[in-house]
Design a protein with these regions (language model features):
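N-terminal amphipathic, basic helical "cap/leader" segment at the start of enzyme domains
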Residues: 1-72, 79, 83
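Short Asp/Glu-rich motifs
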Residues: 23, 50, 130-131, 138, ...
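Small-aliphatic-rich amphipathic alpha-helix that forms the alpha element of a beta-alpha
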Residues: 31, 74, 89-132
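A short coil-to-beta-strand element that immediately follows conserved catalytic motifs
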Residues: 41, 117-120, 141
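Residue-level "edge-of-site" marker
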Residues: 44, 124, 143
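A glycine-rich helix N-cap at a beta->alpha junction
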Residues: 64-70, 135-155
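Short secondary-structure boundary segments
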Residues: 78, 123, 149
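Short active-site-adjacent structural elements
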Residues: 84-85, 128-130, 152-155
């Protein structure tokens, strides 16, 4: 328990070592397994590895260096239409944010157990990424998660 909750720190400078496809799949499963409002599948988790896409995420994150340094970025977004089938404002937007945050936290905890480092990035220009990734207007990007290994573990 200590490893997950007390030893975790945000990393901003990662090694170039890639996160394996197997581990990426595990992290996606863990994120999608997170509790959600009404049990409705309203979260999308998109892995980003291309330099071009990472540069746009870097710009949208107010130039947070962890985004460029990490070999893997997850874009966590919520679908207002999906959740809107059951909930309406003033609750809908806050529920989407909560669901994305819980999914992201699940992934962060899993990374910690797997000796993978993370940097949670909540300060983002969502609209910029939404336009870049050509998402519909009811999809809201909530967080980015930079994922990778410590520089000292590079091999």
């Amino acid at each position: 328990m200590e490893k997950v909750f007390f030893e975790r720190k945000s990393f901003r400078e990662f090694s170039e070592k890639k996160v394996s496809s197997e581990l990426q799949d595990i992290l996606l499963k863990v994120g999608y397994a997170a509790p959600r409002s009404g049990g409705i599948p309203c979260i999308t988790i998109t892995p980003i590895t291309s330099d071009k896409d990472k540069k746009m995420c870097y710009k949208a994150s107010f130039y947070q260096k962890a985004v460029l340094s990490a070999p893997l970025i997850y874009v966590i977004s919520g679908d207002l239409d999906m959740l809107g089938k059951k909930y309406k404002e003033p609750y809908l937007t806050s529920f989407i944010i909560q669901n994305a945050a819980v999914a992201t936290m699940n992934m962060i905890n899993a990374c910690q157990l797997l000796n993978i480092e993370t940097c949670y990035i909540g300060g983002i220009r969502s609209e910029m990424l939404q336009k870049y990734f050509e998402m519909n207007e009811t999809t809201k990007i909530i967080t980015l998660l930079a994922v990778g290994y410590k520089r000292s573990e590079e091999g």
